[in-house]
From Swiss-Prot:
<keyword id="KW-0963">Cytoplasm</keyword>
<keyword id="KW-0106">Calcium</keyword>
<dbReference type="InterPro" id="IPR028846">
    <property type="entry name" value="Recoverin"/>
</dbReference>
<keyword id="KW-0969">Cilium</keyword>
<feature type="binding site">
    <location>
        <position position="79"/>
    </location>
    <ligand>
        <name>Ca(2+) 1</name>
    </ligand>
</feature>
<keyword id="KW-0966">Cell projection</keyword>
<dbReference type="InterPro" id="IPR002048">
    <property type="entry name" value="EF_hand_dom"/>
</dbReference>
<feature type="domain" description="EF-hand 2">
    <location>
        <begin position="100"/>
        <end position="135"/>
    </location>
</feature>
<dbReference type="GO" id="GO:0005737">
    <property type="term" value="C:cytoplasm"/>
</dbReference>
<keyword id="KW-0677">Repeat</keyword>
<dbReference type="Pfam" id="PF13499">
    <property type="entry name" value="EF-hand_7"/>
</dbReference>
<keyword id="KW-0225">Disease variant</keyword>
<dbReference type="GO" id="GO:0005509">
    <property type="term" value="F:calcium ion binding"/>
</dbReference>
<feature type="binding site">
    <location>
        <position position="77"/>
    </location>
    <ligand>
        <name>Ca(2+) 1</name>
    </ligand>
</feature>
<feature type="binding site">
    <location>
        <position position="160"/>
    </location>
    <ligand>
        <name>Ca(2+) 3</name>
    </ligand>
</feature>
<feature type="binding site">
    <location>
        <position position="83"/>
    </location>
    <ligand>
        <name>Ca(2+) 1</name>
    </ligand>
</feature>
<dbReference type="GO" id="GO:0036158">
    <property type="term" value="P:outer dynein arm assembly"/>
</dbReference>
């Protein structure tokens, strides 16, 4: 991508980006095209497919849960075309790295609402907690322990006692205790990974100022 086209894309994306400045957007665009290994050609949209994106989540942000990584991919891939384009990349990372608590609550709830019906059901909690907990070899029936954990979680978070979590239940619980934001699995970067990523990507502002 030539310098003029890069600058135009940077300007366009910066206008619609809440949490990154122009320099940071420019750095993330460059990183995106490095990751996809090419530029946009006539009639062909370049993007990160599910496997490439999951690799970034695993290597860069230390995520290991396949189910959660798939859900994070869907959270970024807003048009559901099977790949994350440059616009989705910038918007997704804006929330992923620097989103407000409100933005992160909406995002995490969507990740945890596996079937998209607007609720986190007991079954969904069970699947996510089963994936995220280490199995103890001494346990005869590890599923029983997970079922108990689901009940404990519901008791703490299900404010209207209907046996499932609505967004209102979840929001209230998280505002009371922010540790519950990622109650069903890590779907945001930890502070160390976030700082390392930003330090690595957002460097050499002089190069940008020369544009």
């Amino acid at each position: 991508m030539n310098r003029k086209k890069l600058q135009k894309l940077t300007d366009t994306l910066t206008k619609n980006c809440k949490h990154f400045n122009k320099f940071e957007v420019n750095c993330l665009i460059k990183l995106f095209y490095d990751l996809v290994g090419g530029v946009e050609r006539q009639g062909l949209v370049v993007g990160l497919d599910r496997n490439a994106f999951r690799n970034i989540l695993h290597v860069t942000f230390g995520m290991t849960d396949d189910m959660i990584m798939d859900r994070v991919f869907r959270g970024f891939d807003k048009d559901n075309d099977g790949c994350v384009n440059v616009l989705e990349w910038i918007h997704g990372l804006s929330l992923f790295l620097r989103g407000s608590l409100e933005e992160k609550m909406k995002y995490c709830f969507e990740v945890f609402d596996l079937n998209g019906d607007g609720f986190i059901s007991k079954e969904e909690m069970f699947h996510m907690l089963k994936n995220s907990l280490l199995k103890q070899p001494s346990e005869e029936d590890p599923d029983e322990g997970i079922k108990d954990l689901v009940e404990i979680t519901l008791k703490k978070m299900d404010h209207d006692h209907d046996g499932k979590l609505s967004f209102a239940d979840y929001e209230l619980a998280v505002r009371e205790e922010t540790l519950l934001l990622e109650a069903f699995g890590p779907c945001l970067p930890d502070p160390k990974s976030q700082m390392e990523f930003e330090a690595q990507v957002f460097k050499d502002p002089n190069e940008f100022n020369d544009m």
